[in-house]
Design a protein with these regions (language model features):
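A short N-terminal helical cap/helix-turn-helix that marks the beginning
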Residues: 188-191
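Charge-rich, solvent-exposed alpha-helical interaction surfaces
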Residues: 180-183
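Conserved pre-motif I regulatory segment
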Residues: 195-199
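Mg2+/Mn2+-dependent nuclease catalytic core
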Residues: 65-177
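Metal-dependent nuclease catalytic cores that hydrolyze phosphodiester bonds in DNA/RNA
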Residues: 1-88, 113
Length: 199
C-alpha cells in the first residue's frame, strides 16, 4: 500500500516573508506597540472594505496545493478584498502604516508579493487571462494620539491618493504571475527538501 504523502501547510504571508525576508506592518516608526498597530490596522481594513461597494468581496479565502516527490505543499490565506473592474478581477491587499505616504513611491516588495500570490491562485482556479493587484496603504492612528476621521468614499477609490491613503494598481498577465509564483515555490522547495532529508 502506497504511503500517504505528508502535507505541509504554509500561509501566503509566511511564505513570502520567508523567501523575501523584508517588510511587514510598519509599527516601528510611530513608537506604539504591536497591539496598538494590530487594532488600528483592523479598523482601517474595515473602513475601506465597507466603502468599496456592493460587488466587493472582503476576506476571500484562497488555497493552492502542489505535489512534490515527498510531500504536498498547501499554500493558504485570505485576500483582503476582491472586485471586478470591467473585465479584470482585482485583488486588494490593505496595509496600515505609520510612515509618510506622500513620499512612498512603490509598494513594499513583501506586501506586493503577498497580493500577487492571491492574484495567481484566484486567476489559476478561475481561468483568468490577467489579474489586477491593488495595494492600498493607509495611515494608522493610535488611541493615545486620537483617532483619525473615517475615510471618505472618494478617498478609497483606487485613483485617489493623499497623505492618509495611497494606492498602487498594477495588472499582470496570468503566465507572468505563474512564472513568478513557480520561482517563489522553487526557492521555498530547496529549504523544504533539505529539512525533509534531515528529519
Amino acid at each position: 500500500m502506497e504511503e500517504k504523502k505528508k502535507e505541509i501547510r504554509i500561509s501566503v504571508r509566511n511564505l513570502v516573508e520567508f523567501i523575501l525576508r523584508s517588510g511587514d506592518l510598519d509599527n516601528s516608526s510611530g513608537g506604539f506597540g504591536e497591539r496598538d498597530a494590530m487594532q488600528a490596522g483592523t479598523r482601517v481594513h474595515q473602513q475601506i472594505q465597507k466603502k468599496r461597494g456592493a460587488d466587493y468581496r472582503a476576506e476571500v479565502p484562497l488555497v493552492h496545493e502542489k505535489e512534490y516527490e515527498h510531500f504536498i505543499l498547501r499554500v493558504e490565506g485570505r485576500a483582503d478584498g476582491m472586485y471586478e473592474d470591467g473585465t479584470t478581477t482585482v485583488i486588494e491587499e490593505i496595509k496600515g502604516t505609520y510612515r509618510d505616504l506622500e513620499t512612498m513611491e512603490e509598494p513594499v516588495p513583501v506586501h506586493l508579493a503577498q497580493a500577487k500570490c492571491y492574484a495567481y491562485i484566484y486567476g489559476l482556479q478561475n481561468r483568468k487571462e490577467e489579474m489586477g493587484v491593488l495595494m492600498t496603504y493607509t495611515l494608522l492612528s493610535s488611541e493615545e494620539e486620537g483617532l483619525l476621521r473615517p475615510l471618505t468614499k472618494e478617498e478609497v477609490k483606487p485613483e485617489h491618493s493623499n497623505w492618509r491613503i495611497r494606492h498602487f494598481l498594477q495588472t499582470y498577465k496570468l503566465p507572468e504571475l505563474e512564472q513568478w509564483f513557480d520561482e517563489l515555490l522553487d526557492a521555498w522547495f530547496i529549504w523544504a527538501e533539505f529539512q525533509y532529508q534531515w528529519q
